[in-house]
Amino acid sequence: MESQTVLPIGREQVLQFRRVLERYSAGLRQTRNRIISSENWWKLRNGTEEQYTQDGGFRSVSGWLHNVIVSKHADLVEGYPEPVLLPREQGDREEARILSAIVPCILEQNQFDTVWSDAMWQKCKTGTACYKIVWDPGKLCGLGDISIQRVNLLNLYWEPGVTDIQKSRFFFHTELCDRDLLQEEYPWLQLKGGDFLDTKFLYDDRVDTENKVTVAEVYYHRRGRLHYCKFVGDQVLFATENQLEPQLDAVGNVLKAPMAETGLYDHGRYPYEFDPLFPIEGSPCGYGYVDVCRSPQTEIDLMKTSFVRNAQVGATPRFFSRQDGAVNEEEFLNLTKPIVHVAGNLGEDSLRQIPVRALDGVYVSLLDRTIDELRQTSGNTETSTGNISAGITAASAIAALQEASGKGSRDTLRSSYRSFGRIVELCVELIRQFYDLPRKFRILGSFGAEEFVSYDNSRLLPVSQGEAFGQDMGLRKPVFDIRIMAQKRNSYTRVTQNELALQLYQLGFFDPARWPQARECLEMMDFEGKDVLLRRLSENAAQPRLPVEAGAAW
């Protein structure tokens, strides 16, 4: 009998992964409960139906917190990022220019506009946005391409106590899959019941998990390489350490070394990016506006509930009635009957109205102060939403107030841009590793003209630096710096930029004869695109000018 090869990842290793997963799940229980609670508040469900009944059938659920999140989401979506890649060496300048045009195309193909919007909802509500950046070999009819998705935090598991997920010993991502579809894809599977199940949000619809099984993906490092294993139950579906054969082309030539040696991705990082709103020490997840504004929102709801009940009592008079009273109660309660019969003399003690004390104005003032506390705490002030106090009419003063009130949103955007920069870094590394065959892209060339380019990773691969003084200088890998620019999607920003250009033109900044004075003035200014404008004016001033004859017409 021929001896069978024992694969590095088998049933015993999967059982170890499952034990680690269950330990991680127990350690992250508090974080997961907070995320679920925040989502419930977003749905304006501050209590259960049983509490509604106990409170008398009504409880006010106002939308002040809802309005805060909607306003913050609008600010974040307005600052949609655009990447610009800058070379670190002069020889990589052209490559950086092409990548700066190609990476936005890849983001557009992944509908990153929608991914960004969904992630910003997630960041405002639960406190953390999470992205998954992987290579999908099934894209483009099997050619493969980069895939960027927003990930549900309840499906992720990492080592409790770490702030950076890259320092976690293992990283898990679980998903519920249909049992029959999984059995069809892997006919040799022997699926069993009682598998590990994810924690889920409280959906409005009834989610049936009876015919679902949990498929888990685990990422881990071994010998400095990033490895990956996909399993269900105690059975391995795929593991990079089990790929012992090199990757071949159609004619049998070796394309790449076995994945057991190279790992999953050359960059060696977990392909996930966390973007917390308000960071927490010892956790990659932060807390969101729901956690900050929960207390004042509860106070507002309680006071409004009391106000409505007091108004109901005042609008519906109630009466004390004696047991031996002479008033016909049925006719008294029937407003359609103009006559109410009584027996004998009608005394004042037969029927007496219950007095209702109207609320004092101090309670309304307290409600207004609580609402103002919520708005000030969240930064969702009237100025930030476009409402300016009476008496302020100057455009510069209004712009200054709005600029000052938006510093909280700008700080949030800066943290999101840092995460987006790391996403672009992973995209560039995936291009470097997998773009062996040329791809076609439509990019914008000079003056907005369409250009169709073919691109592969040949100029991104490490190249030899030769020898110097008898020593091998090793390999050089093109590396790029990433600058993130905000794509402001509002008419006010565009109008302001256009007005600045017109003012510079009217003041003669584009006159080559005034280039020295214009340069001194522009260097003291700060606006978007200043470096490009300085370069163009410098080139324009350096060009030789033909003398203009006297009396020559335009």
Segment roles from a protein language model:
Residues 1-53, 57, 123, 131, ...:
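C-terminal anchoring/interaction modules
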Residues 285-293:
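Acidic/polar low-complexity segments with low predicted structural confidence
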